[in-house]
Amino acid sequence: MAKEKFARTKPHVNIGTIGHVDHGKTTLTAAITKVMAAAGRAEFRAYDQIDGAPEERERGITISTAHVEYETEARHYAHVDCPGHADYVKNMITGAAQMDGGILVVSAADGPMPQTREHILLARQVGVPALVVFLNKVDQVDDEELLELVEMEVRELLSSYDFPGDDIPVIKGSALKALEGEESEMGVDAINRLMDAVDAYIPEPERPLDQAFLMPIEDVFTISGRGTVVTGRIERGIVKVGEQVAIIGIKDTVVTTCTGVEMFRKLLDQGQAGDNVGVLLRGTKREDVQRGQVLAAPNSIKPHTKFNAESYILTKEEGGRHTPFFSNYRPQFYFRTTDVTGVLKLPEGVEMVMPGDNITMEVELIAPIAMEKGLRFAIREGGRTVGAGVVAEVID
């Protein structure tokens, strides 16, 4: 039989398993691939294939991540699983593996543990839109009341971090039994129920094309007789010739008109997400625009200087700092295409930050940058990356 061509007919969603160490994230990941493989919708990946994930470097940070893929009736999923807790922290903060939703794995035998809490907080801070809970190892708990107590505890914990704890689907099962092929309510059935819940509850991501136009400006040129051209890769949305666009960040916002879009020396009617283009701007002087600003649909994004961030500070081994830093530390924050100096304030009760820590901090930049929740940045000192972060909340 000929190999089937991979048909992109189903919507694509990125998900991942999160939760405390040894609660069964990797076993569950393997079990999902096994159950889906039985239906001809995945390639089975054994536990040790997933657990021995190779190291990858993302923005200078070493992260181990395993990627598996599978399909349900409705969707195609790319699923990430990380071997170690530090890998999760780095992954979620750098956005190395984008998550449209997560499966929170909690051992019914232990209940929520410190990393359960930390992963929920991280998911909230970095803007993972939805979570589904898999209450694992139910074969180790005989008492039905105890199971209900653990479920209540998980729901309350989710609610305390602003997830809708009462509405989130909680599926009870045993990843190990499913992996062993046991056709029982806690085995294979539980995996099928889990995937139904993921299909139903985790929203389909909005495609970049359908979002408001935004393009980080990488370069500015003057073309004699035609005006100023800014170049960059369109991050999202569409820009059409004749439309108004705003130049945002660093200086005061200016609204102008796009009078031309060029790609590979050809003139186009429009540019769209993913295209590397030159955009011709009406009546804009070359010195009015600079790298680090963005071109965007008017009123779709605002410039800000003050925000809360969730960040990870590199270890010495990763090429980061060798020493801790304190409040009022002034590094550069690299957003999209440029560095902006900022001052950071540590949370109350935190004296200093050591290399390898992850921390919530308040940052004030010396110049405004077009930003919104979820925007990633690097923390740099003299061109060397010392950390990574994500905007958790815009303050001003």
Swiss-Prot record:
Gene source species: Magnetococcus marinus (strain ATCC BAA-1437 / JCM 17883 / MC-1)
SUPFAM superfamilies noted in UniProt: EF-Tu/eEF-1alpha/eIF2-gamma C-terminal domain (SSF50465), P-loop containing nucleoside triphosphate hydrolases (SSF52540), Translation proteins (SSF50447)
Span list, region G5: 174-176
Known partners and oligomeric status: Monomer.
Residue ranges occupied by any tr-type G domain in the UniProt entry: 10-206
Binding site for Mg(2+): 26
Enzyme class: hydrolase
GO cellular component, one term: cytosol
Family annotation (InterPro entries): EF-Tu_GTP-bd (IPR041709), EF-Tu_GTPase (IPR050055), EFTu-like_2 (IPR004161), EFTU_2 (IPR033720), G_TR_CS (IPR031157), P-loop_NTPase (IPR027417), Small_GTP-bd (IPR005225), T_Tr_GTP-bd_dom (IPR000795)
Record-linked Pfam families: GTP_EFTU, GTP_EFTU_D2, GTP_EFTU_D3
Keywords: Cytoplasm, Elongation factor, GTP-binding, Hydrolase, Magnesium, Metal-binding, Nucleotide-binding, Protein biosynthesis
Region (G2): 60-64
Chain intervals for the UniProt region annotation (G4): 136-139
Reaction catalysis annotation: GTP + H2O = GDP + phosphate + H(+)
Name assigned to this protein: Elongation factor Tu
Taxonomic superkingdom: Bacteria
Binding site for GTP: 19-26, 81-85, 136-139
Gene Ontology terms, MF aspect: GTP binding; GTPase activity; guanosine tetraphosphate binding; translation elongation factor activity
